[in-house]
A protein has these predicted regions:
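Short loop/turn segments at strand-loop or loop-helix junctions that form parts
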Residues: 1-3, 69-71, 98, 148, ...
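N-terminal pre-catalytic "stem/leader" segment of glycosyltransferase-like enzymes
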Residues: 1-67, 74
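Short, acidic Gly/Pro/Ser/Thr-rich loop/turn segments
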Residues: 6-7, 74-75, 102-104, 172-175
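Conserved catalytic-core segment of nucleotide-activated headgroup transferases in glycan assembly
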Residues: 8-23, 149-182
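A short acidic (Asp/Glu
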Residues: 9-13, 39-43, 77-80, 106-108, ...
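Short, structurally constrained coil/turn elements
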Residues: 22-24, 42-44, 88-90, 137-139, ...
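Short coil/turn segments at beta-strand junctions that form active-site/ligand-binding loops
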Residues: 26, 63, 92, 162-163
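Active-site-proximal region of nucleotide-activated glycan assembly enzymes
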Residues: 47-51, 61, 65-76, 82-153
Length: 182
């Protein structure tokens, strides 16, 4: 299970907590880079495995599922160009939890043609319809409308209701400059 290689805190972390709490599987690992600030936090939940280590690659090759909130190549195809030689021997399913709700058409990057996703989680009906009926090329059985794992962790507030306005901006590529590598 993973979020990004350097941090937890997204849907992968909440799915990992859910699996450990409800199934207590000893063979479930959360993947993070060696010097991530989240290692201590995640280690309290379960086993942490470090990205791009021999142990990581061996566990990946022998895994039944790879579950992540991100579908970048370092997670989805960690062997890079060597994947074509290794992938025929790997019988695992990739579960894409997503990071957020898809607003724009991402099918030129996120389609069955480019990503071998076995289960694609959607969290809104409009998003589900867009993916199922759009150019993503996934079989309808691959797409599930379940909501995001981190939303399941929201606490029920049983105190007196308050009138609160929450301003929650989201990231948009059109609002930022170029990507800074680092």
């Amino acid at each position: 299970v993973s979020d990004r290689y350097d941090v937890a805190g997204d849907n992968g972390e909440w799915m990992f907590k859910y699996i450990k709490k409800n199934y207590d599987k000893n063979n479930v690992y959360f993947a993070l880079k060696k010097n991530s600030n989240d290692i201590e936090k995640i280690s309290k939940v379960g086993k942490v495995i470090h990205f791009k280590t021999l142990n990581y690659y061996l566990k990946y090759m022998n895994s039944e599922f790879v579950i992540s909130s991100h579908v970048d190549s370092y997670i989805h195809k960690p062997f890079g160009t060597k994947e074509i030689y290794i992938n025929p021997f790997i019988d695992r399913k990739f579960v894409f939890l997503q990071h957020g709700i898809i607003k724009e058409n991402l099918s030129s990057w996120l389609s069955q043609y480019y990503k071998d996703i076995s289960l694609f989680i959607c969290s809104a009906k409009a998003e589900y319809d867009s993916v199922v009926n759009g150019d993503y090329l996934f079989d309808e059985n691959t797409i599930k409308l379940t909501g995001l794992a981190r939303y399941d962790n929201l606490v029920s507030n049983k105190t007196k209701p308050e009138n609160i306005i929450a301003l929650m901006p989201t990231w948009r590529s059109t609002l930022v400059g170029g990507i800074i590598n680092g």
